[in-house]
């Protein structure tokens, strides 16, 4: 199973994003592939928060357009909704304690714990996720997941 970070959705949605065409093609292929693609509502809400924000984008995405994008993702053939389960908090707490996590590392630890709990490979352009022990992660165009 794959679980994508918010940056993948942003880069596949906003044409001015780095490597937009490649990210869009990657996401389209992944969402229609054979491997289950985990969708976290928390990650999608982060996508909505960022792409509709006029402080982030001069011309932010209209909310209806952003919500339609989310609906397309949620109803894709490979999409599987992922929510924190019974072990999530324990994994999250252990990651936070082990790393002395604070500030902006906390939400990343929360997502890493979700991926670890369901055994997903976390797809992100943020190499900072390498800090989380037990997390399999990779960049979208890499084929070999790293285990850190």
Which residues make up each language-model segment?
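Alpha-helix capping/helix-boundary segments
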Residues: 8, 43, 87-88, 110-111, ...
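Short beta-strand segments at enzyme active-site cores
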Residues: 38-41, 125
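Short, hydrophobic secondary-structure boundary micro-motifs
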Residues: 39-40, 60, 81-84, 141
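Short, hinge-like loop/turn segments at secondary-structure boundaries
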Residues: 54-57, 99-100, 140-143
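Short, well-structured N-terminal submotif of metal-dependent ribonuclease cores
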Residues: 1-39, 55-68, 118, 146-147
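Acidic, PIN/NYN-like endoribonuclease modules and their adjacent C-terminal/linker elements
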Residues: 1, 112-148
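Active-site neighborhoods of divalent-metal-dependent phosphate/nucleic-acid chemistry enzymes
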Residues: 78-123
């Amino acid at each position: 199973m794959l679980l994508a970070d918010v940056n993948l959705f942003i880069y596949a949605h906003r044409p001015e994003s780095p490597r937009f065409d490649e990210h869009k093609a990657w996401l389209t292929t992944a969402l229609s592939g054979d491997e289950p693609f985990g969708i976290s509502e928390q990650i999608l809400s982060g996508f909505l928060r960022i792409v509709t924000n006029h402080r982030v984008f001069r011309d932010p995405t209209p909310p209806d357009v952003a919500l339609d994008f989310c609906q397309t993702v949620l109803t894709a053939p490979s999409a599987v909704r992922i929510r924190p389960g019974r072990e999530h908090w324990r994994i999250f707490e252990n990651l936070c304690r082990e790393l002395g996590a604070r500030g902006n590392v906390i939400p990343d630890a929360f997502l890493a714990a979700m991926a670890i709990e369901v055994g997903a490979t976390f797809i992100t352009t943020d190499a900072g996720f390498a800090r989380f022990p037990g997390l399999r992660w990779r960049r979208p165009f890499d084929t070999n997941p790293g285990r850190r």
